[in-house]
Amino acid sequence: MQTLAQHLTSKAVNESLSQLILTLADTSKAISHAVRHGALAGVLGATEQENVQGETQKKLDIITNDMLKDALKADGTVRGLASEEEDHVVEVCANGQYLVCFDPLDGSSNIDINSLVGTIFSVLPAPQGELTETSFLQSGRNQLAAGYVLYGPSTMLALTTGQGVQLFTLHPETNEFLLTNAAMSISPDTQEFAINMSNQRFWEAPMQTYIADLLLGKIGPREKSFNMRWIAAMVGDVHRVLSRGGIFTYPTDNKDPKKPYKLRLMYEANPMALLVEQAGGKASTGYETILDIQPTQIHQRVAVILGSANEVDACLSYHGLDYSEEPSLD
């Protein structure tokens, strides 16, 4: 089996980008170690701090964020970074070539129940001139690399550099990421969906109708039965989609009118959308292709619908209908 370093060489990924990817991978090994130790190391539980999103930070949110910051500062190729746990962008190296956006511990609410968590990252080219938040506001099409590390029964790295999606598994004895799937591919059709059903009453009419039709199964307009899955960590739900197909969605809702969207564009939706597209799937907000969005702020949130291409198209078809006669959700 190829190691991650050997794979990057075989794909002719340039030296500086390869170095950055290896730094991210090496840091994820240390994060995996911290996650595995859990309560034994006293790293579980919440702090009294909130991040810029107003979410209570877990101890491991802060620990993993600092681990990635320190590693990227030492790497030498990174101009600046943006993190879910940082209010503002962080300048790293004046002559760095890349910008890195990341969610250091996606699904951290799962950590206290020993369920799936992961790290999501996106690599963008660093523009010339002074580093500001605007430097990061590039569409997802500009991503040079994207991936996630899933900390589960095995620690796995899913990676794209624009040449498909490869999956690596961390060998527990050698501590090397080894290539275990050279070409992840999402089947175009599916009978599996992932959504937080507890928010159903807050969704827009198109999503309410779409999910209602899925639940009708063979007796409904879709004429086939669907299974529902929900891990409560985007990294886990998207990994399942990449592994066996499906559709994952976190749609617009009015549960909190000030926050109609849940997932962050720059370090959640964009990297996952690139992975999904590179594996043959589609990713949309319901009204716009995610990778075509022009960001307006670092912590911008968006609705997300991604996965098997034909099923995403089916979902999007509901968003083009007239729901003027439907009861209001207000």
Swiss-Prot record:
Main subcellular localisation: cytoplasm
InterPro entries: FBPase_C_dom (IPR044015), FBPase_class-1 (IPR000146), FBPase_N (IPR033391), FBPtase (IPR028343)
Name of the top EC class for this enzyme: hydrolase
Residue positions binding Mg(2+) 2: D103, D106, E268
Residues annotated for substrate binding in this entry: D106, G107, S108, S109, N196, K262
BP term (GO), one: fructose 1,6-bisphosphate metabolic process
Coiled coil: none
Pfam families membership: FBPase (PF00316), FBPase_C (PF18913)
Any one Gene Ontology cellular component term annotated for this protein: cytosol
Keyword Ion transport among record annotations: no
Family, similarity comment: Belongs to the FBPase class 1 family.
Subunit structure: Homotetramer.
Protein name: Fructose-1,6-bisphosphatase class 1
Name of the gene encoding the protein in the UniProt record: fbp
